[in-house]
Amino acid sequence: LNASNIRAYDLRLSNGGVFHQIGTELGLLHHPVDISSFILEPAERIDLVIDFSEYKGQEITLLNDSPAPPSPGTELIMKFKVGNELKYPDTSTIPEELMPFHKIDPALAAKERTLHLDETTDHYGRVLHLLNNKMWDEPATETPALDTIEIWHLVNHFDFPHPIHLHLVHFEILGRKVFTEEDFDEYGNYKFNLESLTPPLDFEKGPKDVVRTEPGQVTSIVMHFKEHCGDYVWHCHILEHEDNDMMRPLRVEA
């Protein structure tokens, strides 16, 4: 879990070792995935296994390579001191199959929404980061019907990432694409072929509720509102942003 208010982490092992990823925010993967590094935005979670049987007697450091300007010491996260002998035999293994995972078919989407991450200023001239240029207390505009599938295109107009978090529902990342003004129609809706997206990174392929929206890119996600109706929220998970109007109501209607 990245519990930082704003800092992202780009994590790897100092010896070049492998992480065996077994899950994302909202569940296990179908099969384990071997990764050498991963990025965690605020509120993102990842489930990992490290096989230390290969590193007998070694000292290994978990390193942070995030390009964000670090405070002193934030590049060194944790040190593992691997012993030479086990007190008891370890017979544990990572299963080849973890949990059946039924992907959401974007072709079944009842609606596509283009949602812009942008900024304005308040009446004192202070910067406000907003979702679709709307304040928190304005009426809900994201109102999916219960048991429907939707695709959301999150358009990040900033020069830095925003971690976008949806309550209630899990989603899958379809992919990302650098956008230009020509990619939008006269109403600001994104128009393109889903096949033109760059696929999500290996550690993002699972059921999620937080996504890193890259600067200058559209990030497309698909979700199925199939279990609950009512009032929820979606927001940027940078604490200073979500507490200053980068949050919107999400109403699932019966």
Q: Across the structure, where does each feature detected by a protein language model lie?
A:
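Active-site pocket scaffolds in enzymes
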Residues: H20-S36, L108-A254
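Histidine- and aromatic-rich segments of cupredoxin/plastocyanin-like copper-binding domains
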Residues: L1-P100, D105
